[in-house]
Amino acid sequence: MSDVAAEHVEPGVDLTIVTLRFDSIDDASLLAVLSKYIVLTRMHDGCRNVDLCSSVSVPGRHLVVQKWETPEHQRRHFDSATMIDMARSCDGILAGPPDIDLWDATSAHDLR
């Protein structure tokens, strides 16, 4: 993290943030898959929070925002059965591959 970015992060808050953006061709099916995934992911070791957001301006677009205690927790989750099951369940219900991005916690606040 750059020195400038580090100045905006609260002391002691070190998060690994991941976003997954999905564009569906079968919205009801995708929401069912993602809802199950969110519940199971929240139980994973190191998960700080997971949110599911739906776009108001682009119908069928959904965003999953994950916060992890460490990069190792996030990597373990991406290799987990929960993640693999979610990915397999998305077969045939997405307009294209999901957009997955890793974020730097430039300004983060932890409510814990």
List the model feature ranges, each with a label.
Residues 1-13, 51-60, 86-112:
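Glycine-rich beta-strand-turn "strand-cap" elements at beta-sheet edges
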Residues 18-20, 76, 80-85, 106-112:
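Short flexible/disordered coil segments
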Residues 21-31:
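Short, surface-exposed ligand-recognition loops at beta-strand->loop->(often short) alpha-helix junctions
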Residues 26-28, 72-74, 108:
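Residue-level signal for secondary-structure boundary sites
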Residues 14-21, 51-78:
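Short, well-ordered beta-strand segments in beta-rich or mixed alpha/beta enzyme
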